[in-house]
From Swiss-Prot:
It comes from Bacillus anthracis. Pfam families: DUF1444 (PF07285). Belongs to the UPF0354 family. InterPro entries: DUF1444. This is UPF0354 protein BA_4944/GBAA_4944/BAS4588.
Length: 270
């Protein structure tokens, strides 16, 4: 049998077939690239060189190249995961629950409108953790949740502030992909609660913003409702157009007629 670059490509693809790897063949340069699907990191194999080795060592040449490629890709993957951080991300309850059929994401309930997912972030790549990835990482769901919340608490925050009609609005927008995630930082929420004199209202209209408001009158409720709707419509990854009253660690959704609820509460007190 005469070995050609095309035949060698087929032989290597058979030996290196794994669901997490992709193959790209450049017929002009006679190069086969094997790379990780998620990170796009990979190895280029010059096929004429492997064919020349095959002429001398036959099957052993193919085995050696396949082994080298496999070990290199596995090492890349381990290095990437060791540098990666697991962080929680906030998504709408309408966000898909599965990566694909039979492979659910790791999730935690948050509010009536939001759910917590978990991302493996290595700065260059960002992937939501599903059951298959969980197995590859060798972690339990509990470990993922604990690591994610620990890392969320390490995220910095610096708010911009605006006051309208006596109501103060604090905006966090670092565009690091985790602005909404700061809603899970209990110490941050408590520190804001201490400086707020009225109702503490929190909103995560999309992934890249966290709004905390000190609402002291009905106009404030109208403003936060309009503001949240606007941010929700403009967001790259929208979450919810509703905002929440935060009290004692709980989030109560505010509906469009929140100001009417406030009026009713006032009459009952009277």
């Amino acid at each position: 049998m005469k070995m050609t670059s095309k035949k060698m490509k087929d032989e290597l693809m058979k030996k290196l077939s794994r669901p997490e790897w992709d193959f790209h063949y450049d017929s002009e340069k006679e190069v086969l690239r094997i790379e990780q699907k998620d990170s796009k990191k990979g190895i280029n194999v010059s096929l004429p060189g492997v064919v020349a080795k095959w002429e001398v060592n036959k099957e052993k040449a193919i085995e050696e190249v396949a082994y080298y490629v496999q070990e290199a890709l596995i090492a890349m993957h381990k290095e990437e995961n060791s540098a990666a951080k697991i962080l929680p991300v906030i998504r709408s309850t309408s966000f898909p629950k599965q990566a694909e059929e039979g492979n659910p994401f790791i999730m935690t309930d948050h509010t009536a409108e939001t759910r917590i997912y978990y991302a493996l972030d290595s700065n260059k790549t960002y992937r939501l953790i599903d059951e298959r990835l969980l197995q590859k990482l060798g972690l339990t769901e509990k470990q993922v949740r604990e690591m994610a919340l620990f890392n969320a608490r390490s995220l910095g925050y610096e708010f911009k502030q605006d006051t309208v009609a006596g109501n103060t609005f604090y905006f966090l927008n670092t565009n690091d992909g985790y602005d909404a995630t700061r809603i899970l930082n209990e110490s941050l929420l408590q520190s804001m609660r201490e400086k707020i004199s009225g109702d503490m209202v929190v909103a995560v209209p999309h992934q890249d913003v966290l709004i905390i408001a000190d609402i002291v009158n009905e106009i404030g409720y109208d403003i936060i409702a309009q503001m949240t709707m606007k941010f929700f419509a403009e967001g790259h990854v929208p979450i919810t157009s509703l905002s929440f009253v935060y009290e004692d660690g709980d989030f109560e959704p505010i509906f469009i007629l929140a100001k009417n609820r406030k009026k009713t509460d006032g009459k009952e007190k009277g």
